[in-house]
Swiss-Prot record:
The keyword Transferase applies. InterPro entries: CmoB, Mo5U34_MeTrfas-like, SAM-dependent_MTases_sf. The lineage of its organism: Bacteria, Pseudomonadati, Pseudomonadota, Gammaproteobacteria, Enterobacterales. Homotetramer. Belongs to the class I-like SAM-binding methyltransferase superfamily. CmoB family. It comes from Shigella flexneri serotype 5b (strain 8401). It holds the Pfam family Methyltransf_9. Catalyzes carboxymethyl transfer from carboxy-S-adenosyl-L-methionine (Cx-SAM) to 5-hydroxyuridine (ho5U) to form 5-carboxymethoxyuridine (cmo5U) at position 34 in tRNAs. This is tRNA U34 carboxymethyltransferase. One of its GO terms (molecular function) is transferase activity, transferring alkyl or aryl (other than methyl) groups. NCBIfam families: PRK15068.1, tRNA 5-methoxyuridine(34)/uridine 5-oxyacetic acid(34) synthase CmoB. It catalyses: carboxy-S-adenosyl-L-methionine + 5-hydroxyuridine(34) in tRNA = 5-carboxymethoxyuridine(34) in tRNA + S-adenosyl-L-homocysteine + H(+). The keyword tRNA processing applies.
Length: 323
């Protein structure tokens, strides 16, 4: 059974304590009424995993855990079988005691693009919105963050996160809550807020930016990564039924338009720090994610376009400050 008591105890002693006015009731409601039909199966998988304290843990360059003595072939096979029960694995990769989880996304590449532009994360309390399996939260801890809190309503991601955490010795420096940002009160408590790969899924992108701002302390930093298209400050793509086979894509602005949106929401010191085309090396089918991936969503005769004829995925990273 996945338990949030450790997180409640942790925030009871810090500047997130006011969250306890609403959070336990929300989680209790989720446990009672909103659990996925496969959640028990997934959470049982986490229960069956051994809790291992890493002898060597590298979160700075990767998410890699090693034991002092190599695990037996049987132990490795058991861990691998259990982790495969939590497929598909989309965000990673993870290297855990000889089990190498080759995820759909090379999320480490994104982190390498983002990290050089961030304010020093040392000692910071961080919110990661739409955090997936939590890969980037572990990298935030590796970069010196005091606490990383992720929110993502996808319950498989919660179980993937808890599985990795258990194999990292039940590390309590990162926590994932099965919530969407619209369920958070205006906490105004995080030094840095990340929203990566979320904005284009929101029906109201400016409302999302306001919600992100409401989570930041004054002078806090927003890290926003999202799909963009080429164009000036007035360019926004509103796809039809699907974009790259995704139904839930609503607005894809140019990076300059996105900069204006941030300005309209009251952010300052807005910087476009990276723009790059997503490649089929960065997002692809693997043994740990065996269904369709990016190559299936692009025009086979012209990979600069999606199968629907839109520009192929390009992503920008913007950094801004809440005054």
């Amino acid at each position: 059974m996945i338990d949030f008591g450790n997180f409640y105890s942790l925030i009871a002693k810090n500047h997130l304590s006011h969250w306890l006015e609403t959070l336990p009731a929300q989680i209790a409601n989720w446990q009672r009424e909103q659990q996925h039909g496969l959640f028990k199966q997934w959470s049982n998988t986490v229960e069956f995993l051994p809790e291992i304290k890493p002898y060597r843990l590298d979160l700075l360059h990767s998410v890699t855990a090693e034991s002092e003595e190599p695990l037996s072939t049987g132990q490795i096979k058991r861990i691998e079988t259990l982790m495969r029960n939590l497929m598909p694995w989309r965000k990673g990769p993870f290297s855990l005691y000889g089990v190498n989880i080759d995820t759909e996304w090379r999320s480490d590449w994104k982190w390498d693009r983002v990290l050089p532009h961030l304010s020093d994360l040392t000692g910071r309390t961080i919110l990661d919105v739409g955090c997936g399996s939590g890969y980037h939260m572990w990298r935030m801890i590796g970069a010196g963050a005091h606490l990383a809190v992720g929110i993502d309503p996808t319950q498989l991601f919660l179980c993937q996160f808890e599985a990795v955490r258990k194999l990292l010795g039940n590390d309590q420096r990162a926590h994932l809550l099965p919530l969407g940002i619209e369920q958070l009160p205006a906490l105004k408590a995080f030094d840095t807020v990340f929203s990566m790969g979320v904005l284009y899924h929101r029906r109201s992108p400016l409302e999302h930016l306001w919600q992100l701002k409401d989570q930041l302390v004054n002078e806090g930093e927003l890290v926003l990564e999202t799909l963009v298209i080429d164009g000036d400050e007035n360019t926004v793509l509103v796809p039809g039924d699907r974009y790259a086979q995704m139904r839930n894509v609503y607005f894809i602005p140019s990076a300059l338009a996105l900069k204006n949106w941030l300005k309209k929401c009251g952010f300052v010191d807005i910087r476009i720090v990276d723009v790059c085309v997503t490649t089929t090396e960065e997002q692809r089918r693997t043994e740990w994610m065996v269904t369709e991936s990016l190559s299936d969503f692009l025009d086979p005769h012209d990979p600069s376009k999606t199968v629907e004829g839109y520009p192929a995925p390009k992503r920008a990273v913007l950094i801004a400050r809440k005054p």
